[in-house]
Curated annotation (Swiss-Prot):
GO biological process, one term: prolyl-tRNA aminoacylation
Matches recorded under Pfam families: HGTP_anticodon, tRNA-synt_2b, tRNA_edit
Name the UniProt record assigns to this protein: Proline--tRNA ligase
Highest taxon of source: Bacteria
Catalytic activity: tRNA(Pro) + L-proline + ATP = L-prolyl-tRNA(Pro) + AMP + diphosphate
Domain remark in the UniProt entry: Consists of three domains: the N-terminal catalytic domain, the editing domain and the C-terminal anticodon-binding domain.
InterPro entries referenced in this protein's UniProt entry, alphabetically: aa-tRNA-synt_IIb, aa-tRNA-synth_II, aa-tRNA-synth_II/BPL/LPL, Anticodon-bd, Anticodon-bd_dom_sf, Pro-tRNA-ligase_IIa, Pro-tRNA-synth_IIa_bac-type, Pro-tRNA-Synthase_IIa_type1
HAMAP family registered for this protein in UniProt: Pro_tRNA_synth_type1 (MF_01569)
Gene name, Swiss-Prot/TrEMBL: proS
Family: Belongs to the class-II aminoacyl-tRNA synthetase family. ProS type 1 subfamily.
Species of the source: Fervidobacterium nodosum (strain ATCC 35602 / DSM 5306 / Rt17-B1)
């Protein structure tokens, strides 16, 4: 491809709304353009990378015998109502009506639709197991789309679904996907971890995430030297419950003006923040729930949703709380509240003489105690497990790293097949619900994750496996000899099957070099004054520089050797 014919509009300045490196660099380097919040056009460079990611994913799916299909984006509401997720999925689901007033959704995922498909196609155990997958656009109305393609409202996803007649078969397919997804990470060239995860709104009884490490990631991976790893939404807290050794004091209501957080309350009252019990109100299918956690810990919403078996659970709005409880959100507490289920973290059980909201603006209760002053309906593990907490396997302190979730696999069991009446006939002639697995991979998110992990101050550093071009040939001027050799080299490398960009633009060499670094092409061949000495300069995007004899064969051979040694994670400073 000649740069003069290629649409790659690079920018000198970062977009004002860029929050993370991938959003800035993919925009500046001409890979994407923002159309609306969370909605992007992929320009030719971006599309080339996406196609390579898709190719790797497709090859790994082919290797495990999965079958590619393509399902519609628009899905009828009836299917989601059958599974119970029309309401459970929450406000992230994009809903619409057709001209006849019928409800539809722009599919955020396709469990319901694929289950409906197979119930009309598969009717015997002899047709099982089978795995179907697609790569298609998905839609989720994120409350705050952010981080460019990492958290978008429209995104490209590979979603796969397997159907089985027994759990052993599901186990085999689950393991095959786990290996295939690890292969995808390794073939792309990302540093990653496979972690235990929460199943969330998808459901199921076993789940793993494939997380690419990145400082800007929204996933918090906890791992231990024993080999255990889990998403902090999933990792149980197994620390010791500390029982306060003190006499019970009389409860009092005290004036606490202008305090908003647990730390504010602790500072105002002169007590440790762990002596504060935070009260959080959630609203679900069955009304309100009150959750209590120590002031020095955070509530884990996924744990609460799983404990209550209600994925529709959402944090109550300040307006709802003021309307239904008559108190501002910062002064809620369990004392004197009736008609609401109270669930406390296990750590609250050991606390004595703690502080809670006074159910009146600018007031808190001090010296509060469970059982004497209010009742807890149920105890549960509700807190976010964090770095330094004990490993649930060996008890040693956990370490933490940030990451970006790219893949997620689930053992769904019979959740969807039972809800939708999807059954097959077993060998005894009995109708049984399909046992299912689900396997997702964020294709467009992978584009952003690579850049988050592999970039420097000059731009992107693409791994060879997904780079839009492997080589850029850069003549430093339009001098006849330089251009003639550059054209010959370009044609020779193209004939050899190389993906080459010839920068034939009539601009300064500095601008060409800057664009090559910004775009992130692994190898740059500079055709300049060294040609008069029979040499060209080759620079790797990772910084290494070489002089190579200016013959077509020697340049080609050097590039082949460079491909074997090039590692985008090993950069040199110049």
């Amino acid at each position: 491809m000649r740069f003069s014919q290629f649409y790659a509009p690079t920018l000198k300045e970062a977009p004002a709304d860029a929050e993370v490196p991938s959003q800035e660099l993919l925009t500046r380097a001409g890979f994407i353009r923002k159309i609306a919040a969370g909605v992007y056009t992929y320009l030719p460079l971006g599309r080339r990378v996406l196609l390579k990611i898709e190719k790797i994913v497709r090859e790994e799916m082919d290797n495990i015998g999965a079958n590619e299909i393509l399902m519609p984006i628009i899905q009828p509401a009836e299917l989601w109502k059958q599974s119970g997720r029309w309401e459970d999925y929450g406000p992230e689901m994009m809903k619409l009506k057709d001209r006849h007033g019928r409800d539809f959704t722009l599919g955020p995922t396709h469990e319901e639709l694929v289950t409906f498909l197979v119930q009309n196609e598969l009717n015997s155990y002899k047709q099982l197991p089978i795995t179907l997958y697609q790569m298609a656009n998905k839609y989720r109305d994120e409350i705050r789309p952010r981080f460019g393609v990492l958290r978008a409202r429209e995104f490209i996803m590979k979603d796969g679904y397997s159907f089985h007649s027994d759990w052993e078969s599901l186990d085999e397919t689950y393991k095959a996907h786990r290996k295939a997804y690890s292969n995808i990470m390794e073939r792309i060239g990302l540093k990653y971890a496979v972690v235990e995860a929460s199943s969330g709104a998808i459901g199921g009884n076993e789940s793993h995430e494939f997380v690419a490490f990145a400082d800007t990631g929204e996933s918090n991976v906890l791992f231990c030297e024993c080999g255990y790893a889990g998403n902090d939404e999933r990792v149980p807290y197994t620390g010791e419950i500390i029982y306060d050794n003190e006499e019970l004091k009389g409860m009092e209501k005290v004036y606490t003006p202008n305090v908003k957080t647990a730390q504010d309350v602790a500072d105002f009252l002169g007590v440790p923040v762990r002596k504060i019990v935070k009260t959080l109100i959630y609203k679900g299918r069955n009304g309100y729930f009150m959750a209590l956690v120590p002031g020095d810990r955070e509530l884990n919403e996924e744990k609460l949703k799983n404990f209550l078996n209600d994925q529709s659970l959402a944090f109550a709005t300040p307006d709802d709380i003021l309307k239904d409880f008559g108190v501002p959100i910062g002064f809620l507490g369990p004392v004197g509240v009736k008609g609401i289920k109270v669930i406390a973290d296990h750590l609250v059980k050991g606390m004595k003489n703690f502080v809670v909201g006074g159910m009146e603006k600018d007031y808190h209760f001090v010296n509060v105690n469970v059982d004497r002053d209010f009742k807890v309906d149920e105890l549960a593990d509700l807190i976010v497990t964090r770095e330094g907490d004990p490993c649930p396997v060996c008890g040693k302190p956990l370490n933490a790293k940030k990451g970006i979730e790219l893949g997620h696999i689930f053992k769904l069991g019979t959740k969807y097949s039972e809800a939708m009446g999807s059954k097959y006939m077993d060998k005894d002639g009995q109708l049984k619900p399909f046992i299912m697995g689900c396997y997702g991979w964020g294709v467009s998110r992978t584009l952003g994750a690579i850049v988050e992990q592999l970039h420097d101050e000059k731009g992107i550093i693409w791994p060879l496996s997904v780079a839009p071009f492997a080589v850029v040939i850069t003549p430093v001027s339009n001098n006849e000899n330089l251009m003639k050799f550059s054209e010959e080299l370009y044609n020779f490398l193209v004939e050899k099957g190389e993906e080459v960009l010839l920068d034939d633009r009539n601009i300064s060499p500095g601008m060409k070099f800057n664009d090559a670094d910004l775009i992130g092409i692994p190898f740059r061949v500079t055709v300049g004054k060294a040609l008069s000495e029979g040499m060209v300069e080759i620079k790797w995007r990772t910084g290494q520089q070489f002089k190579v004899k200016a013959t077509l064969e020697e340049i080609y051979e050097f590039l082949q050797k460079s491909k074997q040694e090039y590692d985008p994670h090993k950069r040199v400073e110049k």
